[in-house]
C-alpha cells in the first residue's frame, strides 16, 4: 500500500492541496482559473497502472465537484487529459514494489512532443474549454469508445 499512497499523494493530493492554498484568493477576487492535469488513463483504466488511473480519475471527479461549487463566484475549472506525451513519466513510474520502472514505454517514446502538448493545452484554455483531451487519434478514439463501452475498451487495452 505504500506505493499506492505515494502515487495518490503526487497525482491527486498535491493538486488538491495547491488548489486549497490558492482558492481563498480566487474566491475573494471573484475570478480565476484552476487547471488540473489528469490523464487519458483516468478515463480509460490501463493495465499495470491501476493506482495511477485511479488517482487521475479522482482528480477529474474532484475538479468536477469544485467546478459546481465555484462557478457562481466567477472561477473557471478545467481538466486536461493528456494521452501519450514524450516525457520521463514511464521511466520514473513506480512499480508494484515502489521502485522506478527504469525504462521508457514505447507508447510514450512515440507520443506527442511536450512542446506540442503545451501549445494545444494553452490554445484549448484560451478557448475556455473545460474538458481537454490532448493526444493522437488512438487516445481520442479510446476516450470516445470508453464512454460507449468501458468494459470492451478495457479488454482491448490489455497486453499479453
Mark where each language-model region is:
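Active-site loop immediately N-terminal to the catalytic Tyr-X3-Lys motif
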Residues: 46-50
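Conserved small/polar residues in nucleotide/adenosyl-binding loops
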Residues: 156-160
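Alpha-helical segment proximal to the catalytic Tyr-Lys
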Residues: 24, 68-72
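SDR active-site lid
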Residues: 72-137
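Residue(s) in the substrate-gating loop at a strand-loop-helix junction
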Residues: 39
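Active-site helix of classical SDR
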Residues: 19, 55
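Substrate-binding pocket helix/loop in short-chain dehydrogenase/reductase
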Residues: 3-5
